[in-house]
Amino acid sequence: MKRLLLLLFTIHCSLFTFCNPVDDLLERIDKGASAKFKIEKVKSQTDFFELDQQGKKVVVRGNTWVNIASGVNWYLKYYAGIHLSWNQMQAKLPATLPAVKTKERHETDLTLRYDFNYCTFSYSMAFWDWKRWEREIDWMALHGVNLPLAIVGEECVWRNMLLKLGYSEEEIGKFIAGPAFLAWWEMNNLEGWGGPLPLSWYQRQEKLQKQILARMKQLDMHPVLPGYCGMVPHDAKAKLGLNVADAGLWNGFQRPANLLPTDSRFSEIATLYYNELTKLFGKADYYSMDPFHESNDDPNIDYAKAGDAMMQAMKRVNPKAVWVIQGWTENPRPAMVDGMKTGDLLVLDLFSECRPMFGIPSIWKRDEGYKQHPWLFCLLENFGANVGLHGRMDQLLDNFYSDKRNCQGIGFTMEGSENNPVMFELMSELPWRPEKFTKEAWIKDYVEARYGVEDAAIEQAWMILVNSIYNCPAGNNQQGPHESIFCGRPSLNNFQASSWSKMKNYYDPADTKEAARLMNSVAEKYCGNNNFEYDLVDITRQALADQARQQYQHTIADYKGFDRQRFDQDAARFLEMLLMQDKLLGTRAEFRLGHWTQDAINAGSSAAEKKLYEWNARVQITTWGNRYCADTGGLRDYAHKEWQGLLKDFYYPRWKAYFEALAAQMKAQTAPQPELLGGGPNATKTAAELFQMALPQEVKLDYYAMEEPWTLQQNPYTVAPEGSPVEVARQAMDLINIY
């Protein structure tokens, strides 16, 4: 009987699914791959994975499915020369896998590996379906993530809660934000922008979150669900009689109100929230809350009591639950957390590679770190999902291998994913590498793993990159990559594209140009190598953007020197470079606007929904908000992208209009002005005033008036790449070399 049951179980596994989630993952990488591995899950108090050999099969052993998946990834990189990343999550494995000749074991005491920033869910994941989420969870498992933030569908919880509190569907629609802006609603920054959401959206996201949570748990991950810290609609005082604090504005947006955790009705509202959350998505061992996010200290708030009230509300759901909180600017406020019990709070040191708070020098240094509370060393890396090569390799390694008392793990806290895979690969390996190493030694192995080949030119290109653009120095606190000149609103002093990048020059543009030259010099040899072609386009894109910044400076110098002929030539060259960038990026689906807008359109089930979601997608990456929020609030171009389609149809018209306005102004200065004969209205001006008038003047254009119409359009952008990456990269290099 036992044999029969075993036989039936084996048949069931082979017909319907594989017998463990890592085998399933291997099959998604390459059909038939699971037959080449032997997966062994064993009990251990230590987090580990082992690589071993048993006959023709590679053995991957570990104490959790995630750790085993990490071992699979290690083997694929360093034995098989296969690198899986966002641009390539499938690969053809060799018929016979390279043997593990000597057993290899990796252990770590950094047992928690976190993933995601609230912003990631809007800047990258706003319109993802299950198929895309499944790939992401595979990526997470392969890179050791076992503590992922899981906030998809939070709006479903809020809708149910608000209905029970007496809010109408129309009122709820004015409170909950649209798909591309949910993250900032969840962080208590804004209300309603991008909405109202249709009922089908709530149904879609509830189903999606349940699929996400099931897969995460199957892989031994511990999802971090959103907790409750007092957010209520701004009209909650009038509607519900709640004693709330007006949170004011956030970059021009009306913020939701705050029900103070010390209020007598806080427990009631929090209980209602957690009940609805549990009904939909179950209980969790970790809950995320970030009260008072990016807000000034309020003398009317007793932060210690507020923290205790939020903690108690969470503990009523699960007495063993841990509160996960971001270490960002003034948060978590010491007054709120100093009295909390060790183990009840887990702090994400959000920007550890640049602005660590855990006790080593930085502008955000806390002399005592987070005191008794455990925390995670996190890589922020990216803001706004901007496109650009960037990293802080030396800072990352130096900070990680410093004294980190109470550190329990690492975290990926990027605002946008699907960029700079080299930095995320490096970060994911740190828990498994107890001894400090150099970026130069590591990059050699990375390059061989990423492309599956050894090549001196490629290695030289990457050595240049890791010692220049991927090595932003300590003291430079810029937020994310060097922003492309193409993406900024034009002006005489254009430097950064967004309002808050804090960008500084820290590498020589000649370095990215030389790295691009080296990659292009061997491009024909690696035509068809997916990872190589992705990096070839990305590195050449960076070189072209860097050279275009110099071309811009030449053009503005022509204007200031009143050299009309050279101005016309240099302006035309700049615009030619911009259009070449558009063409280059069109050769890869990842860099096409269509992959973003089409996901938005596909999320809709009716023409009206498709229109709303596409508008959300277009606004987020351009104006971000209405005129006031874009201009006065400063949000315009925060999420700018060097993407095919966006360059040609959004950024190009801005620059063309600007250069035409400058040319017209130069022409006007050469025209006769008889009204000024004898001094005219200038007769009474001082010499200093006349001198200022004689200087080259800025032109004033209403950029928002140019930008908003594009956000309202519905012209299609395709996903499918156009042209050969190798051929178009060569054309881009030819253009770079001319200038």
Task: Go through each PLM region and give its residues.
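Second-shell loop/turn segments in exported
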Residues: 57-62, 122-127, 199-200
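Acidic/histidine-rich, surface-exposed loop or edge segments in extracytoplasmic proteins
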Residues: 52-55, 117-121, 193, 531-535, ...
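Active-site-adjacent substrate/metal-binding segments within catalytic domains
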Residues: 110-132, 140
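Catalytic-core regions of glycoside hydrolase
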Residues: 83, 87-97, 116-120, 141, ...
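Contiguous, structured surface segment used for ligand recognition
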Residues: 18-110
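Bacterial Sec-dependent N-terminal signal peptides
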Residues: 1-21
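C-terminal substrate/ligand-recognition segments
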Residues: 502-525, 537-560
